[in-house]
Amino acid sequence: TYLQTPASVFRIDAPQVDTSSQVNLTEVVKGIPSLQLRNRENYAQDLQLSMRGFGARSTFGVRGIRLYVDGIPATMPDGQGQTSNIDLSSLDHVEVLTGPFSSLYGNSSGGTILTSTKEGQGKDSIELSYSGGSHDKSRAGLVLQGGAKGANEPSYVISSSYFDTDGYREHSGAEKVLNNAKLSWNLVDGSKINWVTNYVKIHADDPQGLNRDQWNANPKQQVPFLKQFNVRKDIEQTQTGVTWSKPINDKNELYAMAYLGNRQVTQYQSIPKSTQDASINHAGGVIDFERDYYGADFRWTGKELLPNTTVSVGVALDAMDEDRKGFENFNLVNGQPSYGVKGNLRRDEDNTLWNIDPYLQASWQFLPTWRLDTGVRYSNVHYKSKDNYLSNGDDSGKTDYSKVLPSAALSWQILPELMAYVSYAKGFETPTFTEMAYRPDGESGFNFDLTASTSDTYETGLKSQNQLGDFTLAVFQTKTKDDIVSAGNSNGRSTFRNADKTLREGLEFAWNKKLWRDLTATASYTYLDATFDADIPALGSIAQIPSGNAIPGIAKNQAYASLAWQPSHGLYGGVDVQYMDKVYVNDTNSDAAPSYSVTSANVGYAWVMGDWKVNSFARVDNLFDKNYAGSVIVNDGNRRYFEPADGRNWSAGLRVIKQF
């Protein structure tokens, strides 16, 4: 439970009446301290999430944070995560664990996000929904659900949605199809099975960033020079997984999970012909890869093996096979390049990765009010690349990473409603295939010089549940060696290198309380000082980074407050305010995206009439039309650091549910 967990853990339940468009995870996990959410207004690059400063380097997707959906990894075996396959229309709740404490999850530095889909219950029902808004944004959804009709029969939730938008900026339109299904069996022998399958297909144009003058002149624009490249991304992913748990008796339980998936991505970049012609080692301006990935987790949990103890022992296995190609992004027409097409082959390789991680976690209640939690995980990851494009030499290679990851926490239940804890955990983060794909020196082949980062996190916290509300206060320090940081971004291509030492120190505070009946207030604040803790030497044209500089992409202060009236039916509404401090955009700290505050408001009405339920809503985001950067592209080589956020924008929707 909340008070018994010796870590910063936050849970968000799906609201009884939802006023979101059910498109982006940022609509759900607002207000979590140390979780910085950045909506790029760019569906080609997914959301940017960072936790305690980890993940801010990512130019697309999620890094440094493990993602799970119904116990199935939404993070690839190499550590690259996506939120695009998380179905918000059937979401039950989200749990956020800040810090690397848990031994039950794979290697990461920042923390873990666990999302859970609703299970079918009660009568069969159908839900139809439609929402629309600014920039011709629209989403249509269908949800079918029902409870089990008898013993050993499944309950089910099946959802499907279609989303499209013209986008806030020029060349930022997107289309998305998302299908999700969850079947759950509660068997007569006490075991439980969940089977989850999802499919997502996205086509998204990429407006890329703006420099400061371009942003000030017109935040909606795409740089005119980039229009000729038709920069865009196509994504198609299918994944399925099964979880099984069975109590053997009142003291022993078994758990198993297995999953597999396929992901295909084609991305057209804005790299000119002259750049591609300049070196035989250049991989071209089109990225095209297909990944098959799979894994399993097996765990035994036993209670009272020794008095007042709980022990979990398990092993996790993951593997991925990637077929990666690179093509020129042009054809010659009358001797001139015509961009935005797939041209000649410039890269062809087969990449494989696998890991087998045994782990143990134990809890000992050695005194009535004192508990010791410990864990250890041996993480070992093996990369191999076979080069099939040999005209510029054979760049095949392999590398291995491994680390023993201990963790420990001591907690004291001072009062039934008050708990204090101290903890230590070692984190481990390996580079992804994408981070290793290009060398910062411009040479061909994988960047096998990029090593895994290791971190040591120390934390102390206080939790309380009383008549004044639920409180969480935590102070933490994370020291990282060989931190994986950006070496540069240019025309959509990113390179990475290791920073000898970095330091993150901070404070998290969260509070929520039901003030009266269905009126709830929430507030949170985070202070995070993230710096380079040693000089990073110059590398070619990349300048030296002096010790003490702030790590770019991370706000030092962030705050959130909300007030919501959410009855099960009738009139409902709410308002929230978010503050984000300025964010440096490069390692030299020569420029920054300014701080901002944005306000959102929503109102709606829910009718319940027998077997029918109707929910209507309207909302306005960025109520006061603030011009701010929703995200930054760290170390962009063309100084196009800024991805402007939407101005004042509205959305409205209707959901109709019929039970049978």
Language-model segment annotations:
Residues K192-N194, N198-V200, D234-N388, G469-V475, ...:
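Face-selective signature of the C-terminal outer-membrane beta-barrel domain
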Residues G132-D164, R169-P207, R232-I248, V313, ...:
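Transmembrane beta-barrel wall of Gram-negative outer-membrane proteins
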Residues S245, E253-I271, Q413, M419-A425, ...:
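Membrane-embedded beta-barrel scaffold of Gram-negative outer-membrane proteins
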Residues W300-K303, L367-P368, L372, V381, ...:
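Gram-negative outer-membrane beta-barrel transporters
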Residues R291, T301, L305-D318, E349-T480, ...:
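Structural signature of Gram-negative outer-membrane beta-barrels, strongest in the C-terminal barrel
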